[in-house]
């Protein structure tokens, strides 16, 4: 019998990430087959279109089945991408913030593992029969260092800043080891930045721009847009960066004294808005938001 396929999944508030994919964490249920099977999961007699916008923020991701359903979609995407058989065994590797790792580890493992194996479902019309043999959980952020150990080489202390959709998780590494007493979680993720930016544009210009438009301009990419709205987005990106750096300093991290490794979906935005006047010691940015998921697989 072949060994189980190891699939790393980063269950973000804003996006689901695997080694090869990143897609929005929204999900919409239908009682009948939708007009297209693209990104459509069929499970338990219902149809779910995965990657549609974003879902309401859940303090507890285990409150409903949405993240389990998104997990099945992520598994199917990875199986197809890797050229594996649709009937197979997998080991899931997922992550949790270090601040709540001990509290959430057991229930989140049970949430993903469940009792009825194998799991039978269809994704984009293809039937899958997947046995989830095990679920391993790892600290978010720290797992990315498994991919880029050179970032902490010769650095006695560094700050990991994982800028996600809803939270920004902070953790200091001393001699390459996480210092658990320094873990902080700030509710200052990119969703906050995007929502406040859209509201500012509505007030100042009277336009209703989309999340996707705001994200693209924040990332420094071209798109057709009213120039006043574009200017507001760029200004809000800088204001968000200032606020985040200030909150990190208030949490006890002297960013002028120790290097910062930024990762997560917001890393590129914040790195692009850091200026010399901020006086930061040194900033590294892992701008691929899939780096945590890849690290989980190590």
Regions found by a protein language model. Name each.
Residues 168-174, 182-183:
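Short, acidic (Asp/Glu-rich) active-site segment that either coordinates a divalent metal cofactor
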Residues 162-165, 189:
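Short, contiguous, pocket-lining structural segments
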Residues 201-204:
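Acidic, metal/cofactor-coordinating or nucleic-acid-engaging core segments within structured domains
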Residues 157-159, 166-171:
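Conserved active-site beta-strand-loop modules that form the wall/rim of enzyme catalytic pockets
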Residues 1-158, 177-192, 212-298:
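Nucleotide/phosphate-binding catalytic cleft detector across ATP-hydrolyzing
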């Amino acid at each position: 019998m072949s060994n189980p396929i190891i699939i790393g999944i980063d269950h973000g508030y804003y996006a689901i990430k695997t080694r090869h994919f990143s897609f929005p964490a929204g999900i919409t249920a239908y009682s009948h087959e939708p007009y297209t099977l693209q990104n459509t999961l069929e499970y338990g007699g219902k149809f779910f279109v995965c990657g549609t916008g974003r879902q309401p923020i859940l303090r507890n991701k285990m409150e409903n089945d949405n993240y389990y359903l998104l997990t099945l979609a992520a598994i199917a995407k990875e199986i197809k991408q890797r050229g594996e058989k649709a009937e197979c065994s997998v080991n899931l590797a997922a992550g949790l913030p270090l601040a709540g790792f001990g509290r959430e580890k057991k229930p989140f493992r049970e949430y993903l593992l469940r009792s009825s194996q194998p799991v039978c479902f269809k994704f984009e019309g293809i039937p899958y029969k997947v046995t989830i043999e095990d679920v391993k959980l790892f600290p978010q952020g720290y797992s990315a260092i498994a991919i880029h150990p050179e970032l902490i080489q010769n650095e006695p202390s560094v700050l990991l800043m994982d800028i996600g959709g809803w939270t920004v998780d902070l953790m200091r590494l001393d001699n390459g080891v996480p210092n658990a007493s320094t873990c902080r979680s700030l509710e200052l993720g990119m969703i906050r930045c995007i929502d406040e930016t859209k509201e500012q544009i509505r007030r100042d210009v009277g336009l209703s721009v989309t999340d996707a438009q705001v994200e693209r301009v924040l990332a420094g990419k071209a798109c057709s847009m009213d120039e006043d709205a574009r200017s507001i987005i760029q200004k809000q990106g800088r204001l968000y960066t200032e606020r985040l750096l200030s909150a990190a300093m208030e949490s006890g991290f002297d960013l002028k004294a120790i290097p910062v490794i930024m990762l997560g979906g917001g890393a590129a935005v914040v790195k692009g808005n850091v200026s010399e006047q901020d006086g930061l010691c040194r900033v590294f940015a892992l701008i691929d938001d899939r780096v945590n998921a890849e690290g989980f697989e190590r």
